[in-house]
Amino acid sequence: EQSNQNPVYYCQYAHARICSILRKLQNEGVKIRKPSKDELMLLSSPEEKDLISHLASLTGLIILAANTYDPAKITHYAGELATKFHRFYNAQRVMTDDESVMQSRIFLCNCVRNTMKNVLSMLKIQAPESM
């Protein structure tokens, strides 16, 4: 089922949406670069902080899932990551006039994209770039 009620579709859609955002930015001539540490400090909204915190929790979660023989923890993490990304995307504009904020948000999107791709790969699920 292709709806937000299907957790696999929901996670794949988050990945595809990020890929679409990055393509759109590149098509509009935005030069994507790694932001400085000072620029990354601009990621201060509740949605950004929540997303960053969730990204940082992955390593510990993988260890816990392995130690407890509970791969469902990874599945749950992927769903939460998709939800947190969609919440961020609905609350914050990635493309802004403030170059530093924009580059930091692009970097955050890339971190989510890479993490989602890796988590889906652990679950043997494809991460499509478009849907």
How does the language model describe each region?
Residues 1-131:
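Non-catalytic interaction-recognition regions
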